[in-house]
Amino acid sequence: LARRQRQMCIRDRSTPVERKAIQDSALAAGARKVQLIEEPIAAAIGAGLPISEATGSMVVDIGGGTTEIAVMSLGGVVYSKSLRVAGDALDQSIIAYMRKKMNLMIGDSTAEKIKKEIGTAIPSSNNTFLMKGRDIRSGTPKEIELTEKDACEALMPILNQILGGIKEALENTPPELSADLIDMGLVLTGGGALLKNIDKLISQDTGLPVTIA
């Protein structure tokens, strides 16, 4: 780390022990000084949100393992919530759907490919994907053509959990900051924000404008 000051992201609501462990590790690796920044604030800074101003800003960071939801103002986090559902859970939801609805076993890589090719929060095209897997009943290889509607149905259990977390954050946001969000909306970050039409789904569900950073 070349004996320089380092800024490191930490999980929101990290314990003092966890924070000290991260600082000690960075110092042991050669950093001269370590500044810890909570993940939601780092995501908001990266998205260009005016978090230091006396207005409310909201960021939803959909990563691989967790979804971090935070409302910020005056440089601090006013409300935050961490959900243990995100990109990886979307893949697992596809696997579970294929097994239950199609009697087909697929692996993680196939599920991720389905998510990227035809995954969507709101079906909006006739795109299809020819999926290969193993038939649960016969044990033989099998091909099935999936539609965007199929993919959306597979993803909705996880998307609904994310929507629930966003609604809870909005319900716990102070009224004066809620008024700011009506105009500013919320910002989506992270790999999960790349899911087709997820911004439209969240906007329809919350009534807020949604921007993908």
Predicted segments, located by residue:
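Nucleotide/phosphate-binding catalytic cleft detector across ATP-hydrolyzing
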Residues: R4-Q7, R11-I62, A70-L186, A193-A213
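ABC ATPase A-loop
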Residues: L1
